[in-house]
Amino acid sequence: HSSSDAKNVYVYSYTYDNMERLLSVSLAKDGGNPATLARNTYDEFGHLQNCRLGQSMEGIMQFRYNIRGWTKQIISPHFSQELYYECNFGNSEPCYNGNISAIEWKSKDTTIASTIVSQAYEFFYDGINRLESADYSSSVVPGAETAVGLTLLNERDYSCTYSYDLNGNISSLHRK
């Protein structure tokens, strides 16, 4: 793919393996040498294992899977995410059918060095696997609650509830 304007010409190059999996993304500006933006590696099952980002390739994202091949974790230097299926998380019920029972993500707060903010949703389903509610929670590293801006995080609530009509269409959606 290429795009150009009066001053700049950008050429993106994509490299794939024989199984049509994306191996790398490069960018060349104004006919210069291409710089690698991302490089992917895969495990023996074809799952994305690592994604190295940036020209220095220092920003690495790691992907982990459960025995069924479902994404379980995404880990990077500034962000991590974990999906819960068959495990209890808070009040959520284990889901053995592929539904996600909870998701938790952690990120570094950019305003305060080394402060980790943890946020999560617990999901609840009805008898035919329709999402009934998503309960939000958040927390920060102990001792950081008094930091500017972080106390407000604990006061936010992004929880949702859903209801459906007899045809399975969403009839109401309530956000807090």
List each language-model region with its residue ranges:
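Beta-strand elements of repeat-based all-beta scaffolds
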Residues: 1-176
